[in-house]
């Protein structure tokens, strides 16, 4: 059953802590998308949840490089994008970007207290010590 279409280049998916919101990265767009998840599993209320920082426009359109997604225990959303790991509040406001030497592609919280953010991309892996804790009730 298809639940959404018209997403130019979907890449990266995550659920909110309460599993009522579906987040979808759009690599070829300017925005992280959000959908409300209904009781029957369908999704409604597609919206631009957060604007990626540093998205660029070229002859093929817009690209953000947005790929993997993770959440922390406070519901903040972490996006692996061309500029680094972008961090957004649960309301979609950009808090900042964790810079890396190469563009990241995926990420996950792990370790004691889930206070380590592992990030991979472009032939490299990174370990970032965090103050924030990853969401403990989910593997990623």
Region annotations inferred by a language model:
Residues 1-4, 43-51, 96-100, 137-140:
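Beta-propeller fold detector
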Residues 27, 37, 82, 122, ...:
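Short loop/turn segments immediately following the C-termini of beta-strands
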């Amino acid at each position: 059953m298809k639940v959404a279409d018209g997403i130019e280049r979907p890449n990266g998916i995550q659920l909110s802590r309460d599993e009522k919101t579906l987040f979808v990265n759009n690599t070829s767009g300017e925005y992280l998308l959000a959908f409300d998840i209904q009781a029957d599993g369908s999704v409604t209320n597609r919206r631009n949840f957060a604007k990626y920082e540093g998205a660029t426009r070229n002859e093929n359109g817009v690209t953000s490089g947005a790929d993997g997604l993770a959440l922390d225990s406070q519901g903040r959303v972490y996006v692996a994008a061309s500029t680094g790991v972008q961090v957004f509040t649960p309301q979609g406001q950009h808090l900042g970007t964790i810079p890396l030497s190469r563009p990241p592609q995926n990420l996950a919280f792990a370790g004691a207290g889930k206070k380590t953010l592992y990030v991979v991309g472009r032939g490299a892996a990174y370990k970032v010590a965090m103050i924030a804790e990853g969401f403990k009730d989910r593997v990623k």
